[in-house]
């Protein structure tokens, strides 16, 4: 897992497929954030966030 400054800056951007805004994650994988963008109530682990949103299969 790659460290990110999400907890400090509110922005997690790891790799081309991962960008979460206003999330609380402290670590993230290159292809996956363990957090959801605002408006997403819950993300399943292993989901892939694209842009500022999660796919419908990722959000619960």
UniProtKB/Swiss-Prot annotation:
One of its GO terms (molecular function) is metal ion binding. The keyword Metal-binding applies. PROSITE patterns: METALLOTHIONEIN_VRT (PS00203). A divalent metal cation 4 binds at residues 32-33, 43, 47. Keywords: Metal-binding, Metal-thiolate cluster. A divalent metal cation 7 binds at residues 49, 54, 58-59. A divalent metal cation 1 binds at residues 4, 6, 20, 23. Gene3D superfamilies: Metallothionein Isoform II (4.10.10.10). Residues 29-60 are annotated as: Alpha. Residues 1-28 are annotated as: Beta. A divalent metal cation 6 binds at residues 36, 40, 43, 59. A divalent metal cation 2 binds at residues 6, 12, 14, 25. A divalent metal cation 3 binds at residues 14, 18, 23, 28. A divalent metal cation 5 binds at residues 33, 35-36, 49. Pfam families: Metallothio. Belongs to the metallothionein superfamily. Type 1 family. Class I metallothioneins contain 2 metal-binding domains: four divalent ions are chelated within cluster A of the alpha domain and are coordinated via cysteinyl thiolate bridges to 11 cysteine ligands. Cluster B, the corresponding region within the beta domain, can ligate three divalent ions to 9 cysteines. Metallothioneins have a high content of cysteine residues that bind various heavy metals. This is Metallothionein-1. It comes from Cyprinus carpio.
């Amino acid at each position: 897992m790659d460290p990110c400054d999400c907890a400090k800056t509110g922005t997690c951007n790891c790799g081309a497929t991962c960008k979460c805004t206003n999330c609380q994650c402290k670590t993230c994988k290159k292809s996956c954030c363990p957090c959801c963008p605002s408006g997403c109530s819950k993300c399943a682990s292993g989901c892939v966030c694209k842009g500022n949103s999660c796919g419908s299969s990722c959000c619960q």
